[in-house]
Amino acid sequence: MLDKGEYSFSTCWNIKKHTIGRDMIEEIKELGFRQVELNYNVTEEMMKTIEPMIEKGEIGVSSVHNVFPFIDDKDYDTDSVMLGFDDEVKRKRSVELLIRSMEYANRYGAKAVVVHPGEVPFEYNIDLDLKKLYRDHGKDSPEYQKLWKDMSERRERLSPLYTKRIQDSLEEVSEHAAKQGWSVAIGIETRSRSYQMPTLMEAKTICENLKGGPVYLWYDIGHAMMMDRMGLYDNLKELQEVKRYIYGVHIHETLELSDHWCSYVHSKDLQYFDHFLEAIDFAKVKVYELKAVCQPDEIDESHKLITSKIAAMKG
């Protein structure tokens, strides 16, 4: 397999089929990757066989994904109010968990922690209903537009409150990291549900207000494509505004509203993803975040297309 150089690869691709950490990492190494992103499902048990690999230099860690290692608590899972909790005890716990993830990142020599910072809470997963209406009736249908209006009115009304609270939490974490002398970036990730935070402009606000600290945008390309399709923001236009805040990227493509596919290969569109090549090139950490059905030859082909196109773009 082609040596993937500076590009890293998320363990989300094969974590469900492994119980032994070393086996999971070896399979990723066989794809030609020298670095991995340890995602939030990696357990302490799995790390017992991965840590010796890190120590011996058999694998590098580009990034870890908060909450890391895995904790079995729905309040702090991947779809949570997290750093924006109204409940101060829960908010403090979220801060502590992010600090814990940063400790591990620092120990493993990782450059960044990827974090889902929060959301505007709803009583139920309204995004699930929106996606169903989008698929069944289309974005321009009255059914979709009505529910979208209901969602976005609440989201816009409460966004400043949750943006500020997330920002305050990130400031606490940043201050702790500075005292520890950690050189680890915190990447706030673009999300896959319309009520989740941040949008690109919310990320810009947070990054600007915490300028000089370790907080950056983690640009998840496939998620941003999906949010653009649903109508949350103008991805291509706003990307130009936020590009300078990007620290890392999650590389994958979204087909309709289905994410984590190999760029170019599964969409069979050899042009549209070109819009994101500058962001990939600019990012200090470049991570493929792919679903299990992506095959090694497809991953290879996608990587060749991305890297050759970037090389051509740079002349």
Q: What residues fall within each predicted segment?
A:
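Short, charged helix-to-loop "capping" segments that act as catalytic/coupling loops
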Residues: D72-Y76, K179-W182, S192-Q196, D228-L232
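Conserved beta-strand edge residues that scaffold enzyme active sites
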Residues: V42-T43, F68, E119-V120, R193, ...
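Active-site acidic/histidine proton-transfer and metal-coordination neighborhood
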Residues: L83-Y216
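Histidine-acidic metal/acid-base catalytic patches
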Residues: M1-T11, T19-E27, E44, E55-G57, ...
